[in-house]
Amino acid sequence: MKSTLRISLKSGERIFVNGAVLRVDRKVAIEFLNDVTFLLENHVLQPEDATTPLRQLYFIAQMILINPEGADQSTAMFRKSIVMLLNCFKHDEVLAELKRIDGLVTQGRAFEALKAIRGLYPIEDQILNAQELTPATVEQIRKEIAPWR
């Protein structure tokens, strides 16, 4: 990390830091002085909210950060999912971004990958609303990359 990173948390808010879950009892500011892997509570996607292909991919990528002990398994599932999504989506911007996201995860930059996946949600919503991905395809993806259900 080239510089320190300072974040503010509200009372009762949780943060996931290097696999540990921390909850603060009052408003605080935390300054990270070195490299750290963290995820703010408001960016954590719950399993029941992983209802679309990209949200499922996000859930898998966040598990790489939240559960370091299972990172190898989550990364393998991420790779399988990326391949499937690259074969299903036809939208050029989505395909290019999925390739970039795959590279970010390969480089150990899962936090940045999560931000990039969130950025694709509006396009995915348009694709799903226009049924550019058929409901059957979406259901097949859901079955293949959602073993936590």
UniProtKB/Swiss-Prot annotation:
- Disulfide links within the chain: none
| Any GO BP annotation | mRNA catabolic process
Entry's Gene Ontology molecular function annotations: mRNA 5'-UTR binding
> Which domain of life does this protein belong to?
Bacteria
Which keywords fit this entry according to its UniProt record? Bacterial flagellum biogenesis, Repressor, RNA-binding
Please provide an example of a Pfam family that matches this protein in its UniProt record.
Answer: FlbT
* Full protein name: Probable flagellum biosynthesis repressor protein FlbT
Species per Swiss-Prot/TrEMBL record: Rhizobium meliloti (strain 1021)
Its taxonomic path starts at: Bacteria, Pseudomonadati, Pseudomonadota, Alphaproteobacteria, Hyphomicrobiales
